[in-house]
């Protein structure tokens, strides 16, 4: 395998030419490895190698297009610089259109060759640095150890190198919007706007406004089935342009096949997403992620609330692992925050003291539990009613009525 000290992989079937180029490039300070056949050379290229390929365009059994296809099977961003004779210029031009870095016509101008090599190496180092940053970011910030999570990170890293449209689908709280946000943050359009809209029949007519706001960035549309066929065709046309004005991300609860079967997505838009749809699994499908996620959100909540991180008893941890978590990560994060302030996060968890008491009517138990939940929410948000209502996902008026019922005052929780 080539290490990163070797910066140029040189291919030419003429040994004398190979030696001449090798000598010239080594005198210029580059580490070169020469090969007389591209198939042999390909075996020496490791993943994320920081070098480039410099090759003759016409060799027995291998054209410039063949060579580019061979090397781009594993990494379509590996720079390939072609050297061509006069009669092979059309082939070299075609190869550049299909992804080769550039080409030089024989006789080669050494000065121009060195400039192209340095530009290609600079670009290559930038690509590898971004990949490493993406990998480290996703490893640290996307919590989980399941096989699905490993594949999710890898898929996001791969797609972040493109600006192609992506479809995320699954239940609420499974990471659909998180995936969309990381695609933007780690992608080519990271400096552009991140525009997100939950489409409804009422706002679908504002699509052009959403598109204008997303220029140069990422447009995330939840429930694109609310768009008319004409609007869907328009989105598909924009994504088919050579230079896409923005990255399109679709978010839904169903797969594209299910959307198509229900006649909710136009064929043109379907094919924009067809190769890049990502199924986001529920927590019940990836139980290996539950414990690390709970511990992550517990530490996060304790840091924000300035509380010590409590120990998680073995039985409680077993209960957390057994729970289905129907609202997925969102529900798990809320449970971790409640545990940070002393509330056991499982609805089925019973206070041992209650087992020694006479049976309590169900309505009273429900009221006691509701009062406890509201009390803890007031503690967490220090009596700020808007935040408490949003946290509990109930209207402010309903929250005030419940507080009045249980004799709770927001003033007692402000500190």
Swiss-Prot record:
Residues 142-341 form the Sigma-54 factor interaction domain. SUPFAM superfamilies: CheY-like, Homeodomain-like, P-loop containing nucleoside triphosphate hydrolases. Residues 7-121 form the Response regulatory domain. ATP binds at residues 170-177. Residues 385-404 bind DNA. Phosphorylated by PgtB. Keywords: Activator, ATP-binding, Cytoplasm, DNA-binding, Nucleotide-binding, Phosphoprotein, Transcription, Transcription regulation, Two-component regulatory system. GO terms for biological process: phosphorelay signal transduction system; positive regulation of DNA-templated transcription. It is found in: Cytoplasm. The modification 4-aspartylphosphate is found at residue 56. GO terms for cellular component: cytoplasm; protein-DNA complex. One of its GO terms (molecular function) is ATP binding. InterPro entries: CheY-like_superfamily (IPR011006), Homeodomain-like_sf (IPR009057), HTH_Fis (IPR002197), P-loop_NTPase (IPR027417), Sig_transdc_resp-reg_receiver (IPR001789), Sigma_54_int (IPR002078), Sigma_54_int_dom_CS (IPR025944). It holds the Pfam family HTH_8. PANTHER family: PHOSPHOGLYCERATE TRANSPORT SYSTEM TRANSCRIPTIONAL REGULATORY PROTEIN PGTA, TRANSCRIPTIONAL REGULATORY PROTEIN. Member of the two-component regulatory system PgtB/PgtA that regulates the inducible phosphoglycerate transport system. When activated by PgtB it acts in conjunction with sigma-54 as a transcriptional activator. This is Phosphoglycerate transport system transcriptional regulatory protein PgtA.
């Amino acid at each position: 395998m080539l290490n990163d000290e070797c910066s140029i992989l040189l291919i030419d079937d003429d040994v004398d030419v190979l030696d001449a180029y090798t000598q010239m490039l080594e005198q210029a300070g580059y580490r070169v490895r020469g090969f007389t056949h591209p198939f042999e050379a390909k075996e020496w290229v490791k993943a994320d190698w920081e070098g480039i390929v410099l090759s003759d365009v016409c060799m027995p059994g291998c054209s410039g297009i063949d060579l580019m296809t061979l090397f781009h099977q594993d990494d379509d961003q590996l720079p390939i610089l072609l050297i061509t004779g006069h009669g092979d210029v059309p082939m070299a031009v075609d190869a550049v259109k299909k992804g080769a870095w550039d080409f030089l016509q024989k006789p080669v101008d050494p000065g121009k060759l060195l400039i192209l090599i340095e530009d290609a190496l600079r670009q290559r180092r930038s690509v590898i640095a971004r990949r490493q940053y993406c990998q480290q970011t996703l490893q640290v910030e996307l919590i989980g150890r399941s096989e699905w999570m490993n594949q999710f990170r890898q898929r996001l890293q791969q797609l972040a190198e493109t600006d192609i449209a992506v479809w995320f689908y699954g239940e609420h709280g499974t990471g659909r919007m998180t995936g969309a946000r990381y695609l933007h943050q780690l992608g080519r359009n990271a400096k552009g706007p991140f525009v997100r809209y939950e489409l409804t029949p009422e706002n679908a007519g504002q699509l052009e406004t959403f598109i204008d706001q997303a220029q140069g960035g990422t447009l995330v549309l939840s429930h694109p089935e609310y768009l008319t066929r004409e609007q869907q065709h328009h989105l598909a046309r924009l994504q088919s342009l050579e230079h896409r004005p923005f990255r399109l991300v679709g978010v839904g609860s169903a797969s594209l096949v299910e959307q198509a079967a229900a006649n909710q997505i136009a064929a043109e838009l379907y094919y924009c997403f067809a190769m890049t749809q990502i199924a986001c699994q529920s927590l019940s499908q990836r139980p290996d992620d539950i414990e690390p996620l709970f511990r992550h959100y517990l530490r996060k909540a304790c840091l924000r609330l300035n509380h010590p991180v409590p120990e998680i008893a073995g039985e409680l941890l077993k209960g957390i692992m057994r729970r289905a978590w129907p609202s997925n990560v969102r529900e798990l994060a809320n449970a971790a925050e409640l545990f940070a302030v002393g509330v056991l996060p499982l609805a089925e968890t019973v206070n041992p003291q209650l087992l020694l008491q006479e049976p309590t009517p169900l309505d009273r138990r429900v009221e006691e539990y509701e009062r406890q939940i509201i009390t803890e929410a007031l503690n967490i948000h220090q009596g700020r009613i808007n935040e408490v209502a949003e946290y509990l996902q109930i209207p402010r008026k309903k929250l005030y009525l419940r507080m009045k019922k249980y004799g709770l005052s927001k003033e007692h929780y402000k500190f």
